[in-house]
Swiss-Prot record:
This is Hainantoxin-III 6. GO terms for cellular component: extracellular region; host cell presynaptic membrane. Keywords: Amidation, Disulfide bond, Ion channel impairing toxin, Knottin, Neurotoxin, Presynaptic neurotoxin, Secreted, Signal, Toxin, Voltage-gated sodium channel impairing toxin. Its main location: secreted. Residues 22-48 form a propeptide. Disulfide bonds join 50-65, 57-70, 64-77.
């Protein structure tokens, strides 16, 4: 039951993505359309000056992004809840 629901949801998502891409690029060939859908170059990560959740850090230095703090026990950035 869970597998069939997952496959149905995955099929609907794929149908939505293909439909959206075909509407945005009306007169493109299917090969160009598929290359735009599965393009990886557009999703390259940006370099940032701070470290996000789960990144390793050194306690005492301010390396983590805002709203994160370096855990002295685990030595990685975690959500800062305050005291």
């Amino acid at each position: 039951m869970k597998a069939s629901m997952f496959l149905a949801l995955a099929g609907l998502v794929l149908l939505f993505v293909v439909g959206y891409a075909s509407e945005s690029e009306e007169k493109e060939s299917p090969r160009e359309l598929l290359s735009k859908i599965f393009a990886v170059d557009d999703f390259k990560g940006e370099e940032r000056g701070c470290k996000g959740f789960g990144d390793s850090c050194t306690p005492g230095k301010n390396e983590c992004c805002p709203n994160y703090a370096c855990s002295s026990k685990h030595k990685w950035c975690k959500v800062y809840l305050g005291k």
